[in-house]
Amino acid sequence: MTKSQVNTWGPAISSPAELTVIIVGLGIAGLTAAIECHRKGYTVIGLEKKPDANQLGDIIGLSGNSMRILAEWNNGSLAHLIDDDITCDVTALELFDAEGHQRLAMPYNANDPNQGYLFRRTGLLTKLCHYASQLGIDLRFGVNVDGYWETDSSAGVYANNEKITGDCVVAADGFHSKARAIITGETPAPEDIGVVAYRSIFDADAIADVPEAQWILKKAQTADIWHTYYAKDTMVAIGTAARGRYVHWGCAGALEDRSESWMQPAAPYPVLKCLESWPVGGQLAAAIARTPPGKCFQQALRAIPPLKRWVSTGGRMIVIGDAAHSFLPYAGQGGNQAIEDAAVLGICLELAGTPNVPLALRVVEKLRHGRVSLIQKGSVEAGDCFLDAAWESDDTAERPTAFTHQAWVYAHNCVEHAYKQFHAAAEAVINGREYTPTNVPTDGKFRQQDGKCM
């Protein structure tokens, strides 16, 4: 699809080199936005307060709706992003009860868009950062952004006593975004859902001398495993990555030890205490108890209601990713929707042209807000299913599953959708009309099962 085919609305597209995009936050949303904007020919300045691209976390899944975007990079090859060291090579997601009985084994294929690849989060971010650097994108780490500003013709930030100017600012600074309130004027109150999450990933050498933990390495060097154990109000996922080089585990439940919503270092003792009452607990504890110091993190899960808007009053600043729509982890879509945001951002800037940056950002909001808000709400619904293990229920919808299968989420092509819907959304912005999203189910409901889009 060429520019001449898609840019049928408004003035001709200006030279891409005339547009400078400032991106604050270089996590998954920020790095993919930087790459997508660079691919359109724009000048990108990426700012990150941390000294490098490393982030806390264990495993992240990217399904077909985001992988199709990454697959367009590097001449259509994913080889630069996918290797054995950063992926989980699993052939099945195995589900167990607290007795240790296997209840379900769901075949897993990374090439299935409803499933996708499982990555070590830090490994994926390192790959994204390396690729962006190879492209020559200006990435600046260790930079503290102190303020945001915009005029009718430009926007920028104050960082490390420097005023940085561009045509627009994209804030991808995460769940605890400082930019959110400045850009949107909103400070939504997080809802405590009564769940604490623990997570860890560490070198498998830590369990090498533990006979009771060797079950987790049964496929090491040839494949990985992924086991999820469900009990009332608590679930534990445990497995390997990089064909047995790493052990990862996560626990979410109504545990006694409560923390702030910030992810922070912790010891796994509350998890081990919980497992004492599980018949299978000793098997799991054999590995979890060997978590090295500094490798376990916890946080209280909090649900944030959807924002009313993502774009600043002047139209030259926007929030994306977790800064715009933080998800609970149960929907498995946080990283995926951040990547969709990034791709749609690049397309809207391309189609609107340099003189129309405010229009471009407002169209991004029109195209993305309804979709991610519904998934955001749905992540709470998904959490209820994960933590209410009704193995004996006659209603299959009440039994635990490893993932949901909504085609409108996993099979969505946000690139094709953005090109097709840009003009309708742009006209809605210009004329002050409501825009009806076409990338959500017709009845506007999330559902654990599938729903058809308009």
Curated annotation (Swiss-Prot):
GO terms for molecular function: FAD binding; monooxygenase activity. One of its GO terms (cellular component) is membrane. It is a single-pass membrane protein. Its main location: membrane. GO terms for biological process: alkaloid metabolic process. It catalyses: notoamide E + NADPH + O2 + H(+) = notoamide C + NADP(+) + H2O; notoamide E + NADPH + O2 + H(+) = notoamide D + NADP(+) + H2O. Its cofactor is FAD. The chain crosses the membrane at residues 15-35. Belongs to the paxM FAD-dependent monooxygenase family. This is Notoamide E oxidase notB.
